């Protein structure tokens, strides 16, 4: 559970630490020492005497009592410094522990105490490797508003979210690897995107994960191998993979009107109230993604279609007649990164901007994305079922 910035309740029991990426520097203008502390977004000045000494001890290894005793600063100024740091989101005040959903953790007190005494985790090379790989992820998550444990709870919770990707384009393969590497362990390729008889072609080459030497290999077998290499957390066993998660999302990459299979699949998602997200095929240097549909609650594809017709948008008639194309290497990576970041924000529960909206992107104008929001249309009836 996170706290709001500024709501710090000091206690002698915790060991505060500066967030990853915080920098500080002592300056010496007339009138005494000051410390400038901040990050990429903003910085503040600390005027209290002994501020630099306190900052040097905010490593997460010293308790409040220890810092107070060693800093030799009055309690009022000490509390003022901590409150300022916490208000500006520069401070972590909780130390959460990564819980691996698919790794053994004993609930027997005697066994757990014995493992702790022997420092089993400190000698676990797999866990040490995981901690090294987690560092870049946590260093970004920790800067979100209200995060005060370094982002550990957020990234641990990603193991409880399920993503299924349908499609075999470069963007689909890139998204698959990004989500696995970002901690969404229950990421898989859907049955339409990964067939037993589907072989890797030159079309998929260029997604970083697949090489020219992989052409002709089984798409499903190769992706299974990649999952073990790129996944941040341990991959679930076959038994656990069959257990559906309460929170889930299906991502369809391609034209949903091209094949009866895909059209029927989306209709089935609507009937079963399964959340899904769409990514279009490239069209004349552009591509669009969205909406994220929560059937019965948010605008569906037909809601958007009716709205566009009423607005006189005739371009939608051309979208469904476009030939199947592949994105360039640069565009595939840029689009995949943008989409993955937005979906991860959705998974983490901090952003709902994908719901009921489409984003249009053109490779000739990378800084200008068009974001269009839609509402449930009364003529559609998707919310009446």
Role assignments for model-derived ranges:
Residues 1-385:
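Adenine nucleotide-associated cytosolic modules
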